[in-house]
Each structure stands twice: as structure tokens, then as C-alpha cells.
Amino acid sequence: GYKTKHFSFNVDGGRCDECKGEGVINVSMQFMADIELECETCKGTRFKSEILDIKFDGKNISEILHMTVDEAIEFFKDNEEDKIITKIKPLQDVGLGYLQLGQSSSTLSGGEAQRVKLASFLVKGVTTDKTLFVFDEPSTGLHFHDISKLLTSLQALIELGHSVIVIEHQPDIIQQEKAASDK
């Protein structure tokens, strides 16, 4: 039978043996910059062919990992997979619905990485372990719509019993945070 590890490209089991789940092969060019070539064995899917033969509602693991968070929520909602939705919904809540499920963390901006970390705390829900969060200008580079989601997420952390300190220079955000702290 197949185990969880067969559907992860991070460990041996189901990942492509040739590229070790990277989907690409790095070719050293000695005096020039290295180049990445799509793995010929898995064709960039990162998985062994027998794993790709396994489907959930017509999609294999590679196709699912290429879905954005928003697409995955809709896909799993249609299949009544509430447990999965509960785990990925906080990513949407912090404004990261556009990220692919299998996207490498090395491709994330600093702000995106911060929001992934924030989402990981939101998914935990109420715990006895309380955390002090210090955010240094978390709105940098964010669209106004995403700033609103960020502020909602920070408020959610407070409602879960955590403490939040925000260092910010944008007057609109300072005003909104002040209003939230006065509640």
C-alpha cells in the first residue's frame, strides 16, 4: 500500500529518483552560470509515474500541487474535504490564495514568507501556548486589498490570545491598528 511519504517530493518513496523531487536537473557550466533542465524522467512533475497514475477526482498529486490555494479550496470543497480546506484556508485568509500548493519556499518574497508563518499560527487555533508577534512594517509591498486581509489576520491572532506588536509608518494602517487595539 501507499503511505503519506509516497505523495511527498521531500522524501524517498514516491518522488522521482532522478531529480530527487525537484522536477529539474542542475547542470554545472563551469565558467558560466549553472542551468536547470526539466528532468527527463518525470518531465518536471517531481513524482514517479506509478504515483501519477493515482487520481483523486481526476487529478494526480502533481496536478493538485500545481493548483493555487484558491483553486484547491474550490476543488476540495466540491469533494467535501473539509479537513484539507481547514489546513489551507488560513493561507487564503492572509492574502496568499494565488500561491501554488507545491510552490518552493525559496521563491517566496520576505512578506509572503511572513504571511505563510502567520497562517501556520492561525491554523493551530486556540492553544495554551501564547506567542508575542513583532511585525516590522508588514504592509511593505502589499496591495491595499491584501493589507486589509493582513489586518484581519493580525486581529485573528489577538482573538486567539496572542500578543501582536506592529511597527508601521503608514498612517492609514496605524489608524486601523489603533482602532483595533481600542476594542
Predicted regions and their residues:
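Conserved phosphate-binding elements of NTP-dependent enzyme cores
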Residues: G1-K183
